[in-house]
Amino acid sequence: MKIVGLPTLSDNYTWVIQSENADDKRAWIVDPGESQKVIHYFEENQLQLDGILLTHHHYDHTDGIMGVMDALGEVAIVSNAQGPFKPVTHPVKEGDQVQVLNETFQVIETPGHTDEHICFYHPEALFSGDTLFTGGCGKIWQNPPEQMAESLLKLRALNDDCMVYCGHEYTYANLNFAKIAEPNTPAILDRLAEVKTNTQRNIPCVPARLGLEKQTNPFLRFDHPPLMQTLMERQAQPNESVSTLFATLRAWKDELDQTNILEAGLND
């Protein structure tokens, strides 16, 4: 299995899943937020569109679907059975399996960013959409914090060597926040230095090993004792429940997202 990332819109990724066999021209795409880059890549590489995986319904993950199929042909659209996106042809739910080329992906329901959000898991690859980012996690809008916390803990239980293919490139800002949340964690400082260099050189920071996320992503570490203590100190009434810890962490990140502090320093 070969996975290629196509940068789309301002900071999105559409993922192309291809065969390692050069004679097999079938390929799937994940979360096409726009069509032209996908069409160009398929035509340039003489690929045949075989199917589409959708993690959730937001426009920046779905707006390219019709344009892609107009150009490359209609195919199966696989997404959550409960989602509002009507063109889904193959609805799936927790525990279902999806055959992609010669590989099998497991469907994991991860509500939080949206009600119907799902991830597609293979021991080598996790398409995490806007649930788990490199160094961070997706925003929660109207859903309860405990939903997202539980979804992230489900993903944390997956194998360390799995590569995380998320929906956006937010790695530098996310790790700047991780440094603020856990300032004395060497793994975070080392990763931030590497990510800063790569970002300055326009080298993608996605994908990343899930094992590295477990070491450096505060949204997979909110129940880690030192970070727990920091979060409880930010609460009016200290509470170590998973939902409250996560909500405190997410609110802290949201607060800093309103400033430019997390994007600063790239030109230093």
UniProtKB/Swiss-Prot annotation:
Cofactor binding note from Swiss-Prot or TrEMBL: Binds 2 Zn(2+) ions per subunit.
Annotated catalysed reactions: an S-(2-hydroxyacyl)glutathione + H2O = a 2-hydroxy carboxylate + glutathione + H(+)
GO biological process, one term: methylglyoxal catabolic process to D-lactate via S-lactoyl-glutathione
Sequence positions that bind Zn(2+) 1: H56, H58, H113, D130
Pathway: Secondary metabolite metabolism; methylglyoxal degradation; (R)-lactate from methylglyoxal: step 2/2
HAMAP family: Glyoxalase_2
Name of protein: Hydroxyacylglutathione hydrolase
